[in-house]
Amino acid sequence: TYTSPALTQDTWFRRLSSATIGLITCTEITDTVKVTVINFDPGSVSGAQTICENGTPSAFTSSQNALGDGLITYQWQASLDGTSFTNITGATLKVYAHGAMTTDTWFRRQATSTLNGFQCIDYSGAILVTVNNMTPGSISGTQTICEDTTPAAFTSVPATGDGIITYQ
């Protein structure tokens, strides 16, 4: 058997066999076999962004489409930890628009190149959509007062969330 090193282009192989008896060597060459290399680049995506809770992110775009020798297909995937990705049902175009979000989520695009029934699969880099979660808190102190009278102080429960919180 023979194990070839990694290939980057189509390569043909054949074997030379020799048999020697005494001073006589006979040599024969086998038929050739071809290893077809599917040249493939999964491309890249862009669209990392920060949105407000329940907001809809801008569509993720294809910075570079996948390139390959075969038929190229796409499948978008999502992950809450940036490591374990799952397919997004129906998300099979080179661009993707996600609905409203409440949780930070990583997205990546799987590209598949199919040639002669063989598939090569690779992934774009992952992009993160950061969700700025915030609870507005509350105020109370509804009252009725006379004209030119100062109302009693309002009471409040502070807002909580990601980032710096300010009030107006």
Task: Give the predicted meaning of each segment.
Residues 38-48, 133-142:
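Proline-enriched interdomain boundary motifs that mark the N-terminal boundary
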Residues 9-13, 103-107:
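Exposed beta-strand face motif in extracellular beta-rich ectodomains
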Residues 65-75, 160-168:
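Solvent-exposed loop segments of extracellular immunoglobulin-like
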Residues 1-6, 77-99:
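Surface-exposed, flexible coil segments in extracellular/virion-facing regions
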Residues 1, 14, 76-79, 108, ...:
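Conserved Ser/Thr-centered positions that define the repeating blades of beta-propeller domains
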Residues 55-65, 149-159:
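A short beta-strand segment in extracellular, disulfide-stabilized domains
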Residues 18-26, 112-120:
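Short, solvent-exposed loop/turn segments at the edges of extracellular beta-sandwich modules
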Residues 25-38, 119-132:
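Terminal edge beta-strands and adjacent linker/stalk segments
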